[in-house]
């Protein structure tokens, strides 16, 4: 009799706060180069090309602080640009904070697997403009739920958001939560999140910020106990003020997803979108 379960699948994950394509080399850059957050600069497009080459090696990518097309990005939707360059067919962005024509602050999903459902949620907080993308692969009790988010800077706001997240995922068996959570692995709010949402932190203390001399972990990929983590690392690419965090997981046997092979980036020639100066 043929085996109905071909075995557990591997899934390559990446979470990256890309700071709208701007690199930062020291703390003083936040002040002296703050103008770059308002206007288009050629270095942003160069950085995006470098970021896209990183993304090409993964099956599911969660992005934070990506611009969905505004003045500062030269009216380039960075999500679609990165997806085209890295060969992702399934793309979705969630704009949470729009400042006129200047910026469209967004979370984003890039996936090689077709989602069965995508839901946008607004996160609670004293200051509006935070959200979470909920992406479902499969159906029923054995569906995989992937959450992409960028949490608040303040502890009080984060605790409110954690309560929301715990209520959101409490009935799910297989969860991957990724993003810039703005808190360390040993923080009170992380302990509350792991306990209330029944998630695991596979690599506590994996420093991702600041990218030029990382000394704290603000970026995380958390998983349900049903998901086996095989490898996790912070990648040493300084295209942002955060480092990307990469993880390879093995899914439970009952969860079978149509995961295609990644395209060969060496044969891909991206269309470089024009940059308004």
Predicted regions and their residues:
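Charged helix-capping and loop-helix junction motifs
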Residues: 75-80, 160-166
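Membrane-proximal envelope and lipid/glycan-remodeling enzymes
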Residues: 87-90, 147-149, 193, 233, ...
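N-terminal, active-site-proximal structural segment of metallo-dependent hydrolase catalytic domains
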Residues: 1-85, 98-100, 253-277
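Active site of divalent-metal-dependent phosphoester/diester hydrolases
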Residues: 70-75, 89-109, 128, 182-246
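Beta-strand-turn-beta hairpins that frame and shape the catalytic cleft
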Residues: 3-14, 22-25, 111-116, 129-148, ...
